[in-house]
Amino acid sequence: MIYVLLFIVLVFFSVQVFSLGIMLVHEPSVISPRKVYPKISILLAARNEEELILRNLSALEKLNYPLDKLEILVGNDASTDNTANLIEDFIKDKPQFKLYYIDKTLGKGRGKANVLGQLAHHASGAYYFITDVDVKLPKSWVLALLQEF
């Protein structure tokens, strides 16, 4: 079961990286409005990312997507710097964000795969999107990815 979950997470990550690459080369100038906004779970693994974490969280906060249909799950992977404190301070009074402290290993998963696998267990969205702390996300990121569904 864990291998299936990790495989799914890795497939989603690969599709997302490919889609984001296409968006960065040519971001759609017109994104059709949706009639239905499905619930989206965004998974973000963070380990010792104090230099970039606030930029990424700020970009996620500014996404053009209804807040009640969005959950952003951040997994702090045993950071030894100030990453966890920065995340905690940023997400106060932002119910769409949830921070999870990852201190155990799920199955044989290690590193980022372990963090994403554990976050996937907490996610409740119809779609899971995975990003990385060092990715610059455009406001239209979620809507652009949903254009394909």
What is each PLM-predicted segment?
Residues 128:
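Short aromatic/hydrophobic "clamp" motif used to bind/position activated sugar donors
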Residues 103-123, 144:
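Glycine-rich, basic loop-to-helix element that forms the pyrophosphate-binding segment
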Residues 49-52, 79, 138:
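Donor nucleotide-sugar binding loop of glycosyltransferases
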Residues 82, 133-148:
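Acidic donor-binding/catalytic loop of UDP-sugar-dependent glycosyltransferases
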Residues 22-30, 49-63:
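Short, well-formed alpha-helical segments that are part of the catalytic scaffolds
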Residues 1-36:
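N-terminal membrane-anchoring/stem segments of glycan-assembly enzymes
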Residues 38-41, 71:
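Cell-envelope/extracellular polymer assembly enzymes that use nucleotide-activated donors
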Residues 57-105:
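Acidic donor-binding segment of Leloir-type glycosyltransferases
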